[in-house]
Design a protein with these regions (language model features):
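C-terminal regulatory/interaction regions
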Residues: 103-171
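Metallo-beta-lactamase
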Residues: 2-98
Length: 171
């Protein structure tokens, strides 16, 4: 059996997965929080993310490992079939968050971070406790920062409050 450590950041910083390949070629990935089973995504609606771009890259890395016989995520059931489908579902959930934020800003012109967090939570039907608020707030901030870094959003400080708006695209 061969053991490999694979950097899988995104959900958290410096996350690693462990790939075990047996002598007969069977592959098991201990993925940690780099991938969520379908039921977990449905349960939380908004997967906690520290770095959206890295999260997508980590999902691509998992996809590039080839056929996995077992994928052991940090939460939920083991994934024994349709790993590629599960990867796509994870990506779709991330794209849905991005799309939600962009649509909110198209409709509202500009929003403060806190109002954005509230609106995203309402759209994804999340009933927030204090703990849940912290997780959702961090995730929404991650997406806002990534969209800003990618030239899609801009931020302005108005009366000591951060406001987000779509960056005007040159035609």
């Amino acid at each position: 059996t061969t053991i490999s450590f694979i950097s899988l950041p995104g959900h958290s910083f410096d996350s690693y997965g462990i790939l075990a390949t047996s002598s007969d070629g069977k592959k098991t990935l201990f993925a940690g929080d780099a991938i969520f089973p379908r039921l977990e995504i449905g349960k939380y609606n908004l997967p906690f993310t520290l770095n959206y771009s890295n999260y997508l890259s980590s999902l691509d890395k998992i996809s590039n490992l080839g056929q996995l016989d077992w994928c052991i995520p940090g939460h939920g059931d083991f994934i024994t079939k349709n790993v590629e489908e599960t990867i796509e579902i994870n990506k779709i959930s991330l794209y849905e968050i991005e799309t939600c934020i962009v649509r909110l800003l198209k409709t509202n012109q500009q929003l403060s971070t806190d109002v954005m967090v509230q609106k995203v939570a309402n759209i994804f039907d999340i009933k927030m406790s204090v703990r849940q608020y912290a997780l959702v707030h961090f995730t929404v901030n991650c997406f806002l920062s990534t969209l800003r870094n990618n030239g899609i959003l801009k931020i302005e400080i108005i009366d000591n409050m951060p406001y987000w708006k779509l960056k005007e695209q040159k035609q």
